[in-house]
């Protein structure tokens, strides 16, 4: 087993999706094939410190009572950015011992300082292959403003939005008329539906903007879209083929339950129902799958992405793209691929082998 590929599974991070990242990493570690891969779990603390984690991370779960976090008590380390040193992990103690090398990184990080191109840029400098899109696609996919601008430039269907930059307090009357009600107020660069508010009355707008700005100084206000919420997974294979999964539909509970698919609904509360595959007409489903691949290519993604849609009476509309979707046991991305015929373990192996085949640098 000495020829196994050493895979650094990097998780945690400085974003408000730290806990979800920890749980995703636990699922990935549980499904790594031990005959092919040697796992090197590396946690990033909420303060940004890198530590060598232990195998207990594979048992991490998520609940109202316990949101997991990376403990700073592990061996502090860094990944050298010198590409001539072959992915060396160096201890941050007085001795500066080399703790070994890694062949590839699986950066199962969600949100800023991990999914947004920052870590990807560091890995490019280090010359270490990594799972997922590169710097440009990661940065653009993290920022809802530029995601929609790039997709719209390629002629893909997107919803109406207004960007509130730092220093812009609220919407103008003209913008309110253009958007209509309801609107969704979101941090521009956050995921897992954190900081999102549905606004049905303009009197609540400023409070919603303030809530979003707790997570990001740049805020997006999106026009509400009436339609079915559908997701599609996109996967790149080592030979360069790009495929779309079967679709998943999220069905929100009727009555007094949550009004949209928020953080608690996604990860903590068992209140939504899911259809995998989604019960859509074949022609609509195929249209969504084709749009998902086009969105993947429009942002120059590699490896994987999850593309979220609203299927309206006038056709599908792209809501957003996730360049490192959740990998928890209940996450839609692995569930969609399992329904397509690729189980979790094979999915993880495919992503790693695609990263190794792609390498780093201009391509």
Curated annotation (Swiss-Prot):
Cofactor or coenzyme needed: Mg(2+); Mn(2+)
InterPro entries assigned to the protein according to its UniProt record, in alphabetical order: ATP-grasp, ATP_grasp_subdomain_1, D-Ala_lig_Van_CS, D_ala_D_ala, Dala_Dala_lig_C, Dala_Dala_lig_N, PreATP-grasp_dom_sf
EC number(s) given by UniProt: 6.3.2.4
Catalytic reaction equation(s): 2 D-alanine + ATP = D-alanyl-D-alanine + ADP + phosphate + H(+)
Known pathway: Cell wall biogenesis; peptidoglycan biosynthesis
Binding, ATP: 176-231
Co-factor binding comment: Binds 2 magnesium or manganese ions per subunit.
Any GO molecular function: ATP binding
Record: residues binding Mg(2+) 1: 308, 320
Major subcellular location class: cytoplasm
Start and end residues of each ATP-grasp domain: 148-353
One GO cellular component term: cytosol
Family of the protein in this entry: Belongs to the D-alanine--D-alanine ligase family.
Known function: Cell wall formation.
PANTHER family registered for this protein in UniProt: D-ALANINE--D-ALANINE LIGASE (PTHR23132), D-ALANINE--D-ALANINE LIGASE A (PTHR23132:SF25)
Protein name: D-alanine--D-alanine ligase
Source organism of this protein record: Nocardia farcinica (strain IFM 10152)
